């Protein structure tokens, strides 16, 4: 059976770079999946859509397709795109289907190490949706969510709490959708192994 190692890099390129370098140096990775949430840029793709983009030599693309992931393109940025206007402008500028913050760095490191890599992301907020808070304002210097900044934002704007609770519910559904696709793809891989 294939060995699967899960690495949680956190938010942003710096965290992704540091932990991916460590992991690639300490393991004999045969392939890498960079997974997580993405903001929608393509207005035709609803929240909950699982997209993938991979190297031509990535060995598990067919499993992802059979599991329900759709081919797509990603734009990697240094910040969370909050408003539908920001997402529309990014879509017009780069034409990508979704936006996220880590896969470009992980892909580059895998290319340098000659390790096949694919990005698999679920759209957590569609192109026409504005996020309930500016999550960029909540990030600490190490790109983790600052609980103090979150508390301050909610104290200053308590009317956003219901929207944030609804967003949490939507995010949970998206995480479950991504998990189902990845689990199905892994099971297919195991079943096809000699």
Locations of regions flagged by a protein language model:
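Glycine-rich phosphate- or other oxyanion-binding loops that anchor nucleotides, phosphorylated ligands
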Residues: 1-194
């Amino acid at each position: 059976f294939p060995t699967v190692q899960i690495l949680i890099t956190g938010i942003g390129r710096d965290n992704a770079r540091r932990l991916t370098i460590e992991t690639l140096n300490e393991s004999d990775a045969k392939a890498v999946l960079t997974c997580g949430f993405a903001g929608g840029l393509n207005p035709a793709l609803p929240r909950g859509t699982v997209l993938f983009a991979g190297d031509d030599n990535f060995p598990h693309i067919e499993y992802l397709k059979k599991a329900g992931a759709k081919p797509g393109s990603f734009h990697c940025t240094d910040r969370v795109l909050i408003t539908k206007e920001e997402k529309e402008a990014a879509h017009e500028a780069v034409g990508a289907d979704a936006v996220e913050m880590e896969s470009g760095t992980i892909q580059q490191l895998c290319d340098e190490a000659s390790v096949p890599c694919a990005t698999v992301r679920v759209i957590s907020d569609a192109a026409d949706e504005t996020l309930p808070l500016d999550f960029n304002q909540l990030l600490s210097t190490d790109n983790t969510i600052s609980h103090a900044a979150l508390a301050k934002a909610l104290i200053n704007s308590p009317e956003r709490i219901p929207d944030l609770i609804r967003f949490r519910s939507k995010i949970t559904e998206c995480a479950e959708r991504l998990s189902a696709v990845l689990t199905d793809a892994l099971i297919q891989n195991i079943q096809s192994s000699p």
